[in-house]
Amino acid sequence: MTPLTDRQGKFSPLKATTLALALLPAAVIAYWFFNHQLGPLPVKEALRHVGDWTIRLLVITLALTPLQRLLNYPKIALIRRMLGVTTFAYALTHFLLYIVNSKYDLGFVASEIVLRFYLTIGFVALIGLSLLAATSFDAAVRKLGKKWKMLHRLVYGVAVLGLLHYFIQTKIDVSPAVLMTGFFILLMVYRVFIMKRVSLTPAVLAISAVVACVLTAITEFTWYALATGVDPWRIAQANLMFSFGLRPAVIVLLVGLVPCAFVILRNLRVTEQKQTA
């Protein structure tokens, strides 16, 4: 099975579209870079943008399993491994850009990875993604058998390390890191229900959204309380003051309610079809 074909060897529009969309951010960043649109420190800016998209793609990849269950669309499984490998490619590019930004001084890069905690965990996350990418092909799946699923559960630990790296390296506003963490929390709540074989009913989805919202707010509060000099209570109050824009916890709640609304509308449609049949 190639990146653009399904298990029968036929061209897959779904895989082709997904790959094109996944590579689009890289193409845009490259365009900005070569057209001098990344400011006075283009490599550093490209490094930041690629890192942001690495986390986003990782979260999107983790969202595919619950999305497959919600939509009852098995073909989503076709793009999961491909998107995971693409996420690794972004992570590797992020690391290579860090080397370029360090003037290709590999000794300096190695020492920074050892001495700076956020770089250490970022590098460990990269190693984890490398291992997952190397075993994301059909031959590896067949060879590893049942161990393959166990191995690929490492992705959750990799995500935690990546998000922590994202938090620590953020200099001022950690809202993007909080938002991605909130989405990850939402997906983990879904995973708990799925593991317990609980159906993703509207009530379960609504509960998941509320729980993720609260945990996201707690995460943001805790970070500001422990890692910054900013009053965390001011941040907590901002979650209730929409004049400052939507805070990450609120966005997580709204996004979490979208699947709930989708399932409700789908159930209503099925009921109407049964009544008219």
Predicted feature locations:
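Membrane-embedded alpha-helical bundles that constitute the cytochrome b-like, heme-associated redox core
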Residues: 2-277
